[in-house]
């Protein structure tokens, strides 16, 4: 599920809907802007566009402002310049920490806490990947090291890292236009072509991480009277089937890569180029797995319909850069399926542990959205058929 920023603007949602319309029309040429608005609302976990607009109105102006002394301390540690305005939160905390924006006399920067970061590779390694990707033509916010040369620093009881901020629009929403899908394929081929070594496949994609069985977790949700408990119980067979995708097939060699290159980690620059953010989860994946993951993230429309035009554009973009495409069979979706199963498990546990009314409201909406939008083997097979 997409997450609204802390200070959402309706103009950004309108822009997202217009960009989404291009992808929807590849699936259904009769799609309208109203269809795109409704689809976007669904991606944010709301039933209708008016409900999403009402949430934007409710949240507008609610971004948190950091203590000025903390802003100055972080800016000083990373040598960002003299603080020229309030340091404001950009979004609610995620699985790593929380993103903030700070403006100094040297420009605008995105800084984020790393308090709950579970690294797949160390920060120096992900920065090396970013710099190599940028040198190869990938557009991304340049990471900033501290005065002491560190990527992550402790300031004010939190761990921080910083990036230069690039002018760009809101996060993208799938399905996207063929041009954007092709750019995604090009970025993936560029990263894989770097062939940077890594010692393992990301655990997130390699194996199921949650200790409890799905049936046991569903029973816990029922006992806690979670509003989505029935949906989870009904989804147990689908989740178990996804976890079995490619299980008995040998794992190909991984390369160091972005690892989460979905719509939430991309923006469009003013010139239309793809901006790639969210490198903190960098790690190892076999190229075939990451391309398959991208097809699932980028080429599936609402209600599980496959965007064949977008899927072909993505692999064509990859092929133009790399000379070929590694994804060939259902087993290549193993990483995507395993990662999705782990994500569902994590979100269910977070929803059961949520304490405040606002956190429960957000978590319940997210779990309900996940459980009603799970792909199936049929979805994966249709993606393969689209790019055969």
Residue spans for each PLM region:
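ATP/Mg2+ or Mg2+-diphosphate-binding catalytic cores
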Residues: 221, 343-388
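A glycine-centered beta->alpha junction motif in the catalytic cores
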Residues: 160-174, 217-223, 337-358
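Intrinsically disordered, low-complexity eukaryotic regions enriched in glycine, serine
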Residues: 1-62
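Conserved NTP-binding catalytic cores of kinases and kinase-like/nucleotidyltransferase enzymes
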Residues: 61-147, 270-271, 386-388
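A cross-family kinase active-site recognition segment
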Residues: 174-231, 252-254, 361
């Amino acid at each position: 599920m997409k997450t609204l920023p802390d200070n959402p603007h309706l103009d950004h949602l309108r822009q997202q809907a217009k960009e989404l319309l291009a992808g929807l029309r590849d699936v259904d040429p009769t799609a309208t802007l109203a269809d795109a608005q409704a689809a976007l609302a669904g991606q944010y976990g709301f039933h209708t566009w008016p409900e999403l607009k009402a949430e934007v109105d409710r949240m507008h102006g609610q971004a948190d402002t950091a203590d000025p002394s903390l802003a100055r301390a972080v800016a000083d540690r990373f040598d960002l310049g003299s603080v020229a305005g309030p340091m404001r939160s950009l979004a609610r905390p995620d699985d790593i920490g929380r993103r903030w924006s700070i403006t100094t006399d040297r420009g605008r920067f995105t800084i984020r806490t790393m308090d709950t970061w579970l690294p797949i590779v160390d920060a120096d390694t992900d920065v090396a990947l970013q710099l190599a990707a940028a040198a190869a033509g990938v557009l991304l916010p340049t990471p900033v090291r501290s005065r002491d040369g560190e990527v992550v620093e402790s300031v004010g009881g939190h761990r921080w890292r910083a990036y230069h901020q690039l002018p760009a629009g809101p996060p993208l929403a799938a399905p996207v236009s063929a041009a954007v899908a092709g750019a995604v394929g090009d970025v993936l081929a560029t990263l894989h072509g770097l062939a940077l070594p890594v010692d393992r496949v990301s655990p997130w994609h390699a194996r199921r991480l949650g200790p409890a069985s799905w049936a046991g977790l569903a029973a816990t949700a029922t006992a806690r009277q979670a509003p989505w408990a029935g949906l989870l119980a009904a989804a147990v067979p689908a989740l178990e089937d996804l976890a079995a995708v490619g299980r008995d097939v040998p794992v190909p060699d991984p390369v160091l890569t972005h690892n989460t290159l979905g719509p939430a980690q991309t923006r469009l620059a003013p010139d239309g180029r793809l901006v790639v953010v969210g490198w903190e989860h960098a790690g190892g994946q076999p190229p075939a797995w990451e391309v398959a993951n991208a097809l699932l993230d980028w080429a599936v429309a609402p209600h599980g319909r496959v965007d064949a035009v977008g899927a072909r554009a993505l692999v064509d973009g990859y092929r133009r850069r790399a000379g070929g495409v590694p994804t060939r069979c259902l087993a290549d979706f193993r990483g995507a399926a395993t990662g999705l199963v782990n994500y569902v498990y994590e979100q269910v546990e977070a929803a059961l542990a949520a304490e405040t009314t606002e956190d429960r409201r957000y978590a319940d909406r997210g779990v309900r959205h996940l459980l009603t939008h799970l792909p199936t083997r049929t979805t994966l097979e249709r993606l393969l058929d689209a790019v055969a």
